[in-house]
Amino acid sequence: MSQKIRSTTVIAVRKDGKIVMAGDGQVTMGETVMKGNARKVRKIYDGKIITGFAGATADAFTLLEKFEIRVKEFSGDLTRAAVELAKDWRTDKMLKNLQALLLVADSKTTLLISGNGDVIEPEEDVLAIGSGGNYAYASALALMQNTNLSAREIAEKSLQIAGKICIYTNGKIITEEI
């Protein structure tokens, strides 16, 4: 019997020269919470880039590894690395079956990378992915437009709100900031 592993809400918020990415810690298999403190956001490239993932964990780690190789290959050029990963992801026989989404950000740019070959830069200074992504996204937009909270506070409060709505999102938040 194969049960779908569900996990995650990850959000990126850019405000006042800061980029913050935060993710909850829950991994769920079927109706069971398997882990409550998974690390879904991390810094790479000497702390200059933040990455986050949603989807199948093994798939996401494979893609993060490939992305990190591309970042090094292109000397930290986030956009070029993202575009090249998206091309690989879409055309490689093994990679195209991977089920995950990636958020990546550096001091200037935030991008969503998908297996469809999409590399999307947000119109707003917020991006969110995962099972609770829409809840976190809506919360963050409201907080950005109606409060003076910092990027970190907006990211964390948005995940807390998503966790109250989405059963696949918990309140154990890990945050990274550049």
UniProtKB/Swiss-Prot annotation:
GO-annotated biological processes: proteolysis involved in protein catabolic process
Assigned GO CC terms: HslUV protease complex; proteasome core complex
Keyword list, A-Z: Allosteric enzyme, Cytoplasm, Hydrolase, Metal-binding, Protease, Sodium, Threonine protease
Protein origin, superkingdom: Bacteria
Entry binding sites for Na(+): 163, 166, 169
Segment forming the signal sequence: none
Catalytic activity, as annotated: ATP-dependent cleavage of peptide bonds with broad specificity
Subcellular location: Cytoplasm
Activity control mechanisms: Allosterically activated by HslU binding.
Cystine connections: none
Function summary: Protease subunit of a proteasome-like degradation complex believed to be a general protein degrading machinery.
Assembly behavior: A double ring-shaped homohexamer of HslV is capped on each side by a ring-shaped HslU homohexamer. The assembly of the HslU/HslV complex is dependent on binding of ATP.
Similarity comment: family membership: Belongs to the peptidase T1B family. HslV subfamily.
Name this polypeptide is given: ATP-dependent protease subunit HslV
Organism for this UniProt entry: Treponema denticola (strain ATCC 35405 / DSM 14222 / CIP 103919 / JCM 8153 / KCTC 15104)
